[in-house]
Amino acid sequence: DGESVITAQGEMGTYGTVYTSYLLKYDNTGNGGTVSGQGRGVVDKDTFFSGTFSGVWKRDGANIVMRNLVNISDGTTNLDSIVINTGQRNLSIDVYVID
């Protein structure tokens, strides 16, 4: 099969309620590879954001760790550092605005 899809939803401050899909493609080890996807943020009835991203992922025990470059519809480029804790069924994200 060679790929998996993870969907997530959560609150992200400036971007409001964010809905995201991650497409993980496996490398030959099966413990990492590339990731791409897109997301939508809804702040209020008049304020929406969209973004596309690509990066790399790897397994760290039961966690999935991703590093993505994100292009946001407002012209911002972010570096996202994401950890999905599969045991706890939660996600943490650190966002660094780089442009």
Regions found by a protein language model. Name each.
Residues 1-99:
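Beta-strand-enriched cores of mature, soluble protein domains
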